[in-house]
Amino acid sequence: GADRMSSFGDWVAISDEVDLPTAQILSKAVSDGVIAPGYTPEALELLSKKRKGSYNVIQIDPAFEPAELESKELFGIVFEQKRNNLIPDASLLQNIVTKNKQLPEAAVRDLVIAMITLKYTQSNSVCFALDGQVIGVGAGQQSRIHCTRLAASKADIWYLRQHPVVLGLQFAEGVKGPDRDNAIDQFLRDDLSEAESVELDKLFAVKPEKLTAEAKKEWLRGLNGVALGSDAFFPFRDNIDRAQQSGVKYIVQPGGSVRDDLVIEACDAYGMAMAFSGVRLFHH
């Protein structure tokens, strides 16, 4: 998982029938429920036992279409507008504004995944994607750079979790999955309090040596080809500078900033390819 620290309260949405292998994965994952167009009998039987029968299993009609108009009432005022039925796809990646015009098939896939994620993520938001999955999301921030920093730090943690030292951590007997996830997150942090460090050590059968800053930096050099999507334009080049540190090579954003030229210049300096979609993906 990209952000295992945020799994509590999660729901899983699946676009196809849930089979037994999928249900076996879900049965061990932290989530509050699953929604899908169908379930095999074996999958439904297994999921009905999760959380002592309290796990939410919902079947949705795949042909359902919500109303064309949606409305919200605020302090007695009713706002009505057309439903956002935009389906982000590769057609939004045609306007490549950088010197590097190359978007490999895998990058197109990842950029589309990033845009779809942004459509349903609390604004302001930035999304990192790689190998067909989201690896970091910065959501609900008040500035674009904070979105980028948050998404980048999550992407870094996602990649650091694959470090041999992390994969070789020896946990004490009986330490459950969620506690392991929390422990790995703390193990990779450099700002633990003394109390946190004491509690962390209790979770290991063998106390591990912390990864040094240089060891982390060296490992993160292997993070490359990352796709980044932003739900609105980048107002300053600092977003590009931070994104580059976390392996970003491809970017999609709406464009429209008075400083677009400086942002493009930064992308060109790093050899990035950036497309202007012309579409903001705000979600409030």
Summary of predicted features, one role per range:
Residues G1-Y250, S257-H284:
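ATP-dependent carboxylate/acyl-activation modules
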